[in-house]
Design a protein with these regions (language model features):
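Small/polar loops that bind or transfer phosphate-bearing groups
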Residues: 1-4, 53-54, 112-113
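Beta-loop-alpha module in the N-terminal Rossmann-like domain of NAD(P)-dependent dehydrogenases
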Residues: 1-42
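Structured beta->alpha junctions
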Residues: 5, 28, 54-57, 84
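Short, contiguous strand/loop micro-motifs
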Residues: 7, 26, 52, 104-108
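A near-ubiquitous, low-amplitude feature marking generic local secondary-structure context
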Residues: 22-26, 48, 103-104, 115
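Rossmann-fold dehydrogenase core element
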Residues: 38-55, 75-82
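Predominantly a Rossmann-like dinucleotide-binding segment in NAD(P)-dependent oxidoreductases
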Residues: 56-203
Length: 204
């Protein structure tokens, strides 16, 4: 199982296949097209199997959609409008503070998050994609949108009690203090407790 950070997938996958292992490879497969091609070539050369974790195909909600589309009752599907709704706290956790905050360590959101959605669309349509376009920019989570008098770290900030992105609220009050110490708390620190989380979050 390769479930490391995005930028590590390629190296770990190649080494595992060369060592004789079949792979369950967490998405995204790799961070560049060249790395993806190399993983495919290595799999073919070594006779290893690579399974990518596109798990949403097996969720009851999406299997029902696929069944309905395949039934033909809706005719030919010409357009799919599919939205990836990332909750504000999830955005703050994963893509501002978390493991996917730096482009050097991860992939763009269309790959890191939306590859599930792209996989579903291809699966729903039963055909290969001919073209993909993606556009966007970093706009909201920037220094110019920070409230006046805010600080670099949550726990030093005058708005910590009212901010929707408050680390104290997201990790401590809404989760740890209610006994929910799994994701996302356990991505901040192994075996989290309220005290350990606060200490880790205070250090940034």
């Amino acid at each position: 199982i390769v479930s490391t950070q995005d930028s590590d997938h390629y190296g770990h996958a190649i080494k595992a296949m060369n060592a004789g292992y079949d792979l369950l490879l967490e998405k995204p497969v790799a961070t560049t097209i060249g790395q993806c091609v190399e993983i495919q070539k290595t799999a073919e050369k070594s006779g290893r199997k690579v399974f990518v974790c596109h798990v949403l195909r097996y969720a009851p909600f999406f299997t029902l959609i696929k069944k309905e589309l395949n039934s033909g009752k809706y005719g030919k599907i010409v357009t799919i409008n599919h939205t990836e709704n990332v909750a504000y706290w999830h955005q703050a956790h994963s893509y501002v503070r978390g493991n996917w905050r730096r482009s050097e360590d991860s992939t763009p959101m269309i790959i890191a998050k939306c590859c599930h959605d792209l996989d579903l669309i291809v699966w729903f349509m039963g055909a290969k994609c001919k073209r993909v376009s993606s556009y966007g920019s970093l706009d909201f989570y920037t220094e110019k949108h920070a409230p006046e008098g805010s600080s670099a770290y949550c726990y030093d900030c005058r708005y910590v009690s009212d901010c929707p992105y408050s680390a104290e609220r997201i990790y401590i009050k809404d989760r740890a203090m209610k006994g929910h110490l799994g994701w996302p708390c356990d991505t901040i620190i192994p075996e989290p407790t309220v005290e350990k989380l606060r200490e880790a979050l205070k250090r940034g």
